[in-house]
A protein has these predicted regions:
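Glycine-rich loop-to-alpha-helix module at the N-terminal edge of alpha/beta enzyme cores
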Residues: 59-118
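Active-site and channel-lining beta-strand-loop segments
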Residues: 41-64
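Short capping/connector residues at structural and topological boundaries
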Residues: 26, 48-49, 72-77
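N-terminal alpha-helical segment of soluble enzymes
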Residues: 1-3, 86
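Active-site-adjacent loop/helix segments that line or gate small-molecule/cofactor pockets in enzymes
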Residues: 3-46
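Short, hydrophobic/aliphatic alpha-helical segments
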Residues: 8-18, 51-58, 108-109
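Short active-site-proximal "capping" loops at secondary-structure junctions
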Residues: 35, 49, 68-69
């Protein structure tokens, strides 16, 4: 048995997004599939641990994951605190930040086959 969730707000925004964004998203992998209408969310507005919530307030376990949350989940306090701290100095600079070198060195140390990382 399939239960259809209430997704009125989500699909209304999806229609709006299609007018200005091809496939209603910036990345193909995030595009909602029409075949899963009423089952799969179109937009997520919140996440914590492995759970996410859509625009209509429906809660899901995120089996799709994203590039960031696949390792630690969403709203990981240690990471979020570090981000907030860095935001005071600015983010997304036009040149590399020293932290990039520190992180790359750590990754090369712990990944036996990695000589360099990006």
């Amino acid at each position: 048995m399939t239960t259809t969730l209430g997704m009125k707000k989500s699909w209304e925004l999806h229609g709006q997004a299609l007018q200005v964004i091809p496939m209603a998203t910036q990345t193909h992998s995030k595009a909602p599939r029409e075949a899963l209408r009423g089952i799969e969310p179109c937009f997520l507005v919140r996440g914590k641990g492995c759970r996410v919530w859509d625009l209509d307030g429906n809660e899901y376990i995120d089996f799709r994951n994203g590039l960031g949350p696949i390792t630690l989940g969403y709203f990981y306090p240690t990471v979020d605190d570090a981000i907030r701290q860095q935001m005071e100095d600015g983010i997304i600079f036009s040149y590399p930040h020293p932290l990039e070198v520190e992180v790359a060195e750590r990754l090369v140390r712990v990944i036996p086959c990695a000589e360099r990382v990006r």
